[in-house]
Amino acid sequence: MNVITKLMYSIHRILGTLLCILFLMWFLSAFVMMYHRFPRVSAKEKMQKLDMLSQTGDSLPDISSVTARLPRGVKVRSTILNLNAGHPEFSFSTTKGTLHFLADSTISRPSLDSEHLHRTAALWCSSPITRIDTLHSLDQWIPFAELKKEMPIYKIYFADDAGTQLYLSSQNGEALQFSNRSERFWAWLGAIPHWVYFTWLRQDTVLWTKTVIWLTALGCLMVIAGIWVTVD
């Protein structure tokens, strides 16, 4: 047995011992993900739950005067007109993220008051609200770093059999997450272990990316060593 083969045996044995449970978990969680994804609010759901604009005809400015407020050089991908605490607001999806501008440039952006919070929640679930938590840090169901700008975030619990929860941004009342008990259960068996979606790790995008890359690299090295040992 030459030196390279001995090295490959050692690499395969050590990495196999360390990573076997991880790879078994990754393999089994992939089956769960074929039927259950990580709960997220889709763009279609958001469109369906948007507050109704006044049918009496709110006075809206010319769209060119609104786009003139965008930073120079920004390219607009899509535009949504919605109500923010009763005020018409344009949301522009751009190359620099989503930018929000009230139709009336003379007023400041309103805060999300209790009345608007409850009205928005009712659009998502008709059951009574049992509790509202004010979050100042990310949790397991909103572990993404880009949501930090929405802080504080309101977590709303509904009194229904499904265990429904809704997360709303305090900045504009946008729904950030909407899930029930069943979706959260399957996420623990599928998406969370498969994508390493643990809050403490996923909220740090750089660390999470490096962790996934290193685990992938070590897994590939283990497989290559195993193939070498088999062929040799």
What annotation goes with each model-predicted range?
Residues M1-D232:
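Conserved histidines in hydrophobic membrane contexts and catalytic metal-binding motifs
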